[in-house]
């Protein structure tokens, strides 16, 4: 990243707590973070540190108790639920530890599904899905359902699905957590290459310090507070 790198997503003073009767649990505490266009950012931390909650808030899958989240300057939590859903479909991609592929659909259909939901031409969506699957090395597995794919192959399908609508930002929650070391390395290589090819930003929540160390920036989450671990850019700092 360069000094002129443009901000894509800004998390401003975000806090999150839950109430259970008279007990209040603070999950996030005044988090500030800028994600830049095209960068790869890792957030590491122990279970329960708040990193997945932060990722969900960034993706409008959970609501902050306080604070602001801006995507290209648009305040996500001042929008209607319909507009939020549109942003999730068009501007955001999601990858999870457990791929969440639809079991009755083939690999190509799973990848094309977000494009179908967007209302794109079905024939073109399938062409785009085929191209992405070929890009991640699965051109020979287009018509296989998830049960016929290995764990690494299913995760590659999930990565292709996350990219089908050419999102500005992909949010990945433990994308290598269910894979062996070799498959995990392959997933990272694909993230890096696809980020460079499409200019997509990636935020990856992970326990995998080896994976995190390869990203442009590495932050750690502890007790709901973000801290800088490493950055390859002079702009790569949490505010």
Curated annotation (Swiss-Prot):
EC number: 7.6.2.-
GO MF: ATP binding; ATP hydrolysis activity; transmembrane transporter activity
Enzyme class: translocase
Listed Pfam families: ABC_tran
Role played: Part of the ABC transporter complex LolCDE involved in the translocation of mature outer membrane-directed lipoproteins, from the inner membrane to the periplasmic chaperone, LolA. Responsible for the formation of the LolA-lipoprotein complex in an ATP-dependent manner.
Matches recorded under PANTHER family: IMPORT ATP-BINDING PROTEIN, LIPOPROTEIN-RELEASING SYSTEM ATP-BINDING PROTEIN LOLD
Subunit text: The complex is composed of two ATP-binding proteins (LolD) and two transmembrane proteins (LolC and LolE).
UniProt-recorded name of the protein: Lipoprotein-releasing system ATP-binding protein LolD
UniProt organism field: Shewanella frigidimarina (strain NCIMB 400)
Highest classification ranks of the organism: Bacteria, Pseudomonadati, Pseudomonadota, Gammaproteobacteria, Alteromonadales
């Amino acid at each position: 990243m360069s000094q002129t790198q443009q901000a894509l997503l800004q998390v401003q003073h975000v806090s999150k707590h839950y109430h259970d009767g008279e007990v209040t649990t603070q999950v996030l505490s005044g988090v500030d973070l800028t994600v830049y266009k095209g960068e790869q950012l890792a957030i590491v931390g122990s279970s329960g540190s708040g990193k997945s909650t932060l990722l969900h808030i960034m993706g409008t899958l959970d609501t902050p108790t306080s604070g602001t989240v801006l995507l290209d300057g648009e305040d996500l939590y001042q929008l209607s639920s319909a507009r939020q859903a549109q942003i999730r479909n068009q501007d955001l991609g999601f990858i999870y530890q457990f791929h969440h592929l639809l079991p009755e659909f083939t690999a190509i259909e799973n990848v094309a599904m977000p494009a179908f939901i967007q209302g794109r031409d079905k024939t073109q969506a399938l062409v785009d899905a085929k191209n992405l699957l070929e890009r991640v090395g699965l051109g020979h597995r287009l018509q296989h359902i998830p049960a016929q794919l290995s764990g690494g192959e299913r995760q590659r399908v999930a990565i292709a699905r996350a990219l089908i609508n050419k999102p500005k930002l992909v949010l990945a929650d433990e994308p290598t957590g269910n894979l062996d070391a070799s498959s995990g390395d392959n997933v990272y290589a694909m993230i890096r290459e696809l980020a460079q090819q499409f200019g997509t930003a990636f935020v990856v929540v992970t326990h995998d310090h080896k994976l995190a160390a390869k990203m442009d920036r590495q932050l750690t989450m502890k007790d709901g507070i973000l801290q800088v671990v490493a950055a390859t850019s002079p702009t790569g700092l949490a505010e």
